[in-house]
C-alpha cells in the first residue's frame, strides 16, 4: 500500500508528515487516518501542521497501516515487547507482537536489550507489524560497547539512531531532556532515576562531567529524522518512580527542557510527542497533563500509566489503568500499557494480553468521557445484544471475545445456552432483563397513571 505513496518522496531532504502538512499538502497517510478516525482530512492536516497530532510513519515501514496520535483522535494504547539477556527470543517476541495487534495495540515498542541479535529481532518485528514500531536506541548503543556506558561517544548514539531509522522504526524515545544540572534535584527522591535510558545518560554525565550528548547533538538527530520521517518520542528520564516523587522539581525541570526541544524539532518540521509519568496520585494527574500541554505547546502526551498507588505488585495493570483512564480523560493522546509483571519480571504473552485489555478499557473510557464521535456506539450495540440475550453478539463486541466466551462457558458450555435468556449468575428465574417492558404495557400504564392523577385532582 505505502510503496506507491512514498516512492515520489524518496531522496527529498524532508519527508515528514509535518513538512507536507505545513505546505498545505494532504498526504495519502493523512487521508487514510481521517477515514479511520471519522474526521476530515483537512482537520488531520491542520492538527499535524500545528504539532498537536502525529502520524508515526517511517518511509521504510511499507506494510504500515497509518494511525494518528493526538488530542483530536481517539486515545491510543502502546504495548511494549522486547527480549532481554535473561529471557525471551525472536519467536517469542513475534508471538507477543501478534497478540498485541490482535488485542488492539495501536503501536508497539521493541525494548529488546538482549536475547539474540538486536538488529534481526527489530527487523523481524518491523516486517511483521501493521502498526507503528517504536524503539529506544540507547539500549543498543549500550549493548554495542558491552555495557561500558562511560565508553559511549556521541557518534555511537548517532550511528545507532541512523540504523534504526533506516530499518523502518516509526518513532524513537530520545532521552535528550535530562541535563547535567538536573541531577542534584533527584537527591530528595525515594526511588531516584527509574528510567533505564535516563539512568544510562545520568551515569555517562556523572562519569564525564559533560552535558547530555543527546541534548548537545539534538540538531543532528533532527536531520536523521527528517530524512526518514521518524517521530520523536521525547523520553522523560526523570519521571517519578513512586507516588512520593510525583510532580517534583526534577520532573518539572526536565519537562521544561522537553518543551524547548519540542519547539526546536518543530522548527525543522519534525513530528514530536512527549513522554510522561509514571507514578502519580490521582489528585495530581490533571495537573500533570495540563502542565505538559503548557510547557510543550500541546504536543501529544504519551504516558506510562500512571500508577496511582505503589502497593500492588502483580496487579499494576489495574493500579495504572485507573490513572491511565483519568489521564486520557484530561487529554493524554496515548497510554503506554503496564502488565501484571511490572516491577517483577519480563512479561509473557498472557501478561501482554491482560495489560493491553486493561489499557484498551482505559482508553475507551476516556474516549467516551471526551465525547469523541462514535465512541459509545459499540457500548450501545453490546447493551442491546445483552438485553436481547444475544450471547454470540455480546462475545463478538467484547474487547476480549475469547475471554468473555470462556467465562460464560465455564458454567453453561452447551450450545443451547447461547440462546438462553439467563446466565449462571441469576439463573432462569431471577434475571431482571427478562422483564420486557413493551410499548403496549407502557401505554396502558400511562393511561392508568393519568386517571389516578385526575382522580386526585377531583374536589371532594
Swiss-Prot record:
Q: Which InterPro entries does the UniProt entry name for this protein?
A: ThiC (IPR037509), ThiC/Bza_core_dom (IPR038521), ThiC/BzaA/B (IPR002817)
EC number per UniProt = 4.1.99.17
EC main class here is lyase
Q: How is the cofactor bound?
A: Binds 1 [4Fe-4S] cluster per subunit. The cluster is coordinated with 3 cysteines and an exchangeable S-adenosyl-L-methionine.
What is its pathway? Cofactor biosynthesis; thiamine diphosphate biosynthesis
What's a Pfam family this protein contains? ThiC_Rad_SAM
Q: Which residues bind [4Fe-4S] cluster?
A: 423, 426, 431
The Swiss-Prot or TrEMBL record lists the needed cofactor(s) as: [4Fe-4S] cluster
Q: What intrachain disulfides are recorded?
A: none
Gene3D superfamilies named in the record: 6.10.250.620, Radical SAM ThiC family, central domain (3.20.20.540)
The reply to whether RNA-binding figures as a keyword in the UniProt entry is no
Per the record, what are the reactions this protein catalyses? 5-amino-1-(5-phospho-beta-D-ribosyl)imidazole + S-adenosyl-L-methionine = 4-amino-2-methyl-5-(phosphooxymethyl)pyrimidine + CO + 5'-deoxyadenosine + formate + L-methionine + 3 H(+)
Q: Which terms under GO biological process does the entry name?
A: thiamine biosynthetic process; thiamine diphosphate biosynthetic process
From the Swiss-Prot or TrEMBL record, what is one GO molecular function term?
A: 4 iron, 4 sulfur cluster binding
Transcription: present as a keyword of the record?
Answer: no
Q: Which UniProt keywords apply?
A: 4Fe-4S, Iron, Iron-sulfur, Lyase, Metal-binding, S-adenosyl-L-methionine, Thiamine biosynthesis, Zinc
Recorded GO cellular component terms are: cytosol
Binding residues annotated for Zn(2+), in chain numbering: 279, 343
Domain of life of the organism encoding this protein: Bacteria
Ligand binding (substrate): 80, 109, 139, 175, 195-197, 236-239, 275, 302
The record's family statement is: Belongs to the ThiC family.
Tell me, what does this protein do in biology? Catalyzes the synthesis of the hydroxymethylpyrimidine phosphate (HMP-P) moiety of thiamine from aminoimidazole ribotide (AIR) in a radical S-adenosyl-L-methionine (SAM)-dependent reaction.
Q: What is this protein called?
A: Phosphomethylpyrimidine synthase
Q: Which organism is it from?
A: Microcystis aeruginosa (strain NIES-843 / IAM M-2473)
